[in-house]
Curated annotation (Swiss-Prot):
InterPro entries: Acyl_CoA_acyltransferase, Bact_Acetyltransf, GNAT_dom, Mycothiol_AcTrfase. This is Mycothiol acetyltransferase. Acetyl-CoA 1 binds at residues 87-89. SUPFAM superfamilies: Acyl-CoA N-acyltransferases (Nat). 1D-myo-inositol 2-(L-cysteinylamino)-2-deoxy-alpha-D-glucopyranoside binds at residues 43, 187, 227, 239, 278. Catalyzes the transfer of acetyl from acetyl-CoA to desacetylmycothiol (Cys-GlcN-Ins) to form mycothiol. Acetyl-CoA 2 binds at residues 243-245, 250-256. The gene is mshD. Keywords: Acyltransferase, Repeat, Transferase. One of its GO terms (molecular function) is mycothiol synthase activity. Residues 12-152, 160-307 form the N-acetyltransferase domain. Its EC number is 2.3.1.189. PANTHER family: AMINOALKYLPHOSPHONATE N-ACETYLTRANSFERASE-RELATED-RELATED (PTHR43877). Coiled coil: none annotated.
């Protein structure tokens, strides 16, 4: 373990966190998310944080009282795309130079391109990114919809039926379909069996809410994987976690039918009254589909890059 001291904050770098340190990061993330209305770390980062075998670099700043005041997670598993960065500062310790210190320590630690997510698109994050030479490269929108509003019931294409995902049986066929459906997606299309297994092991996993569209020959043609977010002190909310359609099945209304089926599941089987999803701003076809189904923009998540 070694330390650097940019600005007024002492930044410590390590390649491994012990369980109490991980708990401190999760506490910081919860405080930042409650203050900002958007969690600072995405699912990928949280999964890697809890995996003792996942390679990563961790930058931390502790206040004089020992509280974790700032944290940055560096993911170098995709060198072609650049090192992925997510960072957060505890609300109590903001406006003390900690965010800038972490960002500069990231730059001092990493050689090569950097890509950083700012969840919630807060003005302070945008200003810091621009000041440090990052450019706005990609935007994900979070859309939301009340489940109390009527849900359309579009028909499935002829011969197509829906059934639940079967863990251990459907894994390979689903991974192949996912790769086809997201061939141009920077993250989703590269999922491996380990990625699927990690999510199957999460407490929120619900095979009954992982809907598969199957043609008469038994081939998978599409899927709608739903998720329920449960957070103490906050109302539950459903998510269109991943929705995909085989390119050969495009244009037949399967995407709309799958979306509606998942929404009905979240409302009728899980008792939820609202749902959210994430969609790339550039995916105009998907945005249009979701808007027709009653979704509206809620927040933005911005990817910044620096060469």
């Amino acid at each position: 373990m070694n330390s650097t001291e940019p600005d007024s904050a002492r930044v410590t770098r390590t390649d491994r966190l012990d369980p109490p340190e991980i708990a401190d990061v999760l506490t910081l993330a919860r405080a930042a998310g409650d203050a900002d209305g958007a969690d600072p770390f995405d699912e990928h980062t949280l999964l890697r944080l809890r995996d003792p075998h996942a390679p990563a670099h961790h930058l931390t700043v502790r206040a004089a009282d020992g509280i974790l005041a700032g944290y940055a997670h560096l993911d170098s598993t995709d060198p072609a795309a650049g090192t992925g960065v997510e960072l957060a500062v505890h609300p109590t310790y903001r406006r003390q130079g900690i965010g800038r210190a972490l960002a500069r320590a990231v730059r001092a630690t990493v050689t090569g391109p950097l890509r950083a997510w700012a969840h919630g698109d807060h003005p302070s994050a945008a200003a810091l990114a621009v000041d440090l030479g990052y450019r706005r490269a990609r935007v994900l929108w979070q859309l939301r919809r009340p489940l109390s509003a009527p849900i359309p019931q579009p028909p499935l294409p002829e011969g197509v039926t829906l059934r639940a995902f079967r863990p251990g049986t459907d894994d390979d066929a689903w991974l192949a379909l996912n790769a086809r459906a997201f061939a141009d997606h920077p993250e989703q299309g590269r999922w491996t069996s380990a990625d699927l297994r990690a999510r199957r092991d999460e407490p929120w996993f619900d095979a009954a809410g992982f809907l598969l569209a199957v043609d008469p020959a038994g081939h998978l043609r599409g899927f709608h994987w739903t998720k329920v977010h449960e957070r103490p002190g906050s109302p539950r909310i459903g998510e269109v976690y991943v929705l995909g359609v085989d390119p050969q099945a495009h244009g037949g209304g399967l995407g709309k039918a799958l979306t509606a089926a998942g929404l009905a599941y979240l409302r009728d089987r899980r008792g939820l009254d609202r749902v959210m999803l994430y969609v790339d701003e550039s995916n105009t076809a998907a945005v249009a589909l979701y808007e027709r189904l009653g979704f509206a923009r809620w927040s933005a998540h911005v990817n910044y890059q620096r060469s």
